[in-house]
Amino acid sequence: MHRKKVRQFIVTSSSRNQVNLLVEYLFNGFNPFEFIISSEDVELKKPNPLPYLKAIQLSGINKNNSIVFEDSNPGLISSLAANLPTIFVPSNIPIVLEKNIKLDCILDSLGDENNVANVIKGPKLKKSYVDYSFLSDYLVSFSNAKN
C-alpha cells in the first residue's frame, strides 16, 4: 500500500504508547501511518463513531474513498455508524457478530504471499492476499450497493 501511496491511519481504543510500541516492532522503526487516533484523542471511544469521524476530518478524505479494517464488534459498530466502507477481519474465530450488524466484506485474514486470505463474504481476491486491486474493487462494490 505504501508503494501505491495509499494513505493509512490507525483508529484504536488502545493507548498511543501501546500502538507506538507495536508499530515500532512490526515495521522496524518505519511508520507507514500518517496519524493515530488513540483512546487519549477522543472523549467517546468505540463503539461510538467519533474516533472514525475524527480520522476522516483530520485526513480530509471523502468517506466513500476510505476503507476501514476492523477486528472487533465495538470497532464495527463505530465504523458502520460513521457510514464508512468496512472490511471485517475478525481477531476471534468463530465469528460472533452482534445482532443488526450488516457487512458486505468479511475476511479471515489479510493474507500475504505465503498465507492465503479467505473471503467469507465480499468480492473475490485476485491474489492470495488483500492488495490494491481488491480494495479498489471493494470500494466500487460498496458504492454500487449504496446506490
Question: Where do the protein language model's features map onto the residues?
Answer:
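Short, acidic loop-to-helix structural element flanking the phosphoryl-transfer center
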Residues: 1-10, 16, 20
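Asp-based, Mg2+/Mn2+-dependent phosphohydrolase catalytic module
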Residues: 15-147
